[in-house]
Design a protein with these regions (language model features):
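Substrate-binding cleft of carbohydrate-active enzyme catalytic domains
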Residues: 138-144
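N-terminal hydrophobic targeting/anchoring segments and the immediately downstream early-domain regions
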Residues: 1-134, 138
Length: 144
């Protein structure tokens, strides 16, 4: 039997070297990191760039991961794999083509809405629930 992999399935924190090292000490193998709640494309690019600086500064403890193989490799190397995700698809704005751009930039989770109505779907705070929008269906098709 192989050892299990420990994944923190959703995290938002005041990231720092201390936290990165605590994750390693706690044997956290991977973290789904929120890089966008309601940010625009440009604001989210800035978040990715901040993470790229952290990857360069702390390569012994964290690494960007885009696949299950990346997570396994990080674990074998004693590093925590960082997986980018959105809590809301606002960074794709109204441009379907940005789905692929974000995929190439390492985003692997895209939640259609957070709490409020988005261009893609209804959030849990909305009184009426019309579900997934036309654009939401197009984005899902593009993601798949």
């Amino acid at each position: 039997m192989t050892e299990s992999i420990t994944i923190d399935c959703l995290q938002y924190a005041a990231w720092s070297e201390k936290i990165f090292r605590q994750m390693r000490q706690g044997n956290v193998d991977a973290v789904h990191v929120t890089i966008a709640y309601h940010e625009t494309f440009r604001e989210t690019v800035a978040n990715v760039e901040e993470w790229n600086r952290w990857f360069a500064a702390y390569p012994e403890v964290i690494v960007n991961a885009c696949s299950a193989a990346d997570v396994r490799t990080a674990r074998e190397q004693g590093r925590t794999a960082i997986i980018f995700g959105f809590q809301n698809c606002s960074p794709i704005e109204d441009d379907l083509g940005l789905v692929q751009v974000w995929h190439r930039m390492g985003v692997r989770f895209m939640q259609l809405s957070y709490n409020n109505q988005s261009l893609l779907a209804t959030g849990c705070y909305e009184r009426e629930d019309p579900g997934i929008t036309r654009m939401g269906r197009q984005v899902i098709k593009e993601m798949n």
